[in-house]
């Protein structure tokens, strides 16, 4: 198991966004997380959900606090991940959601 968070890729970003995280076309990517993470660390993972399936995971390389949500004015943390990530051959069913949820990686296939 590998601890981390799940983030849903919005439908309007399309499968092209998901593909770019795993095909080598980008070297890093930035996710946003409300507040300051109490459990998350560099080396943990962001598991990406698209169309109600976990598609893969990317390792966290930096957590940068002090950012502000431009709409609400509330604090948030920027979560920088290394790409390309590990893409699943068979996606894992997982309901998409808004925001961030901690995830223990229990469904991730053993290597």
What are these regions (language model features)?
Residues 44-46, 56:
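Residue-level detector of short, conserved catalytic/binding motifs and their immediate flanks
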Residues 55-66:
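Short beta-strand-centered aromatic/proline hotspots
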Residues 64-80:
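Short, solvent-exposed secondary-structure boundary/capping segments
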């Amino acid at each position: 198991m590998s601890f981390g968070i799940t983030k849903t890729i919005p439908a309007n970003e399309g499968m092209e966004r998901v593909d770019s995280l795993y095909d080598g076309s980008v070297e890093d990517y930035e996710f946003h997380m409300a507040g300051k993470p109490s459990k998350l660390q560099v080396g943990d993972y962001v598991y990406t959900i698209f169309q109600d399936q976990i598609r893969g995971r990317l390792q966290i390389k930096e957590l940068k606090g002090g950012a502000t949500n431009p709409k609400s004015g509330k604090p948030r943390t920027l979560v920088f991940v290394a790409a390309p990530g590990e893409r699943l051959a068979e996606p894992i069913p997982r309901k998409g959601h808004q925001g961030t949820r901690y995830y223990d990686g229990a469904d991730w296939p053993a290597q």
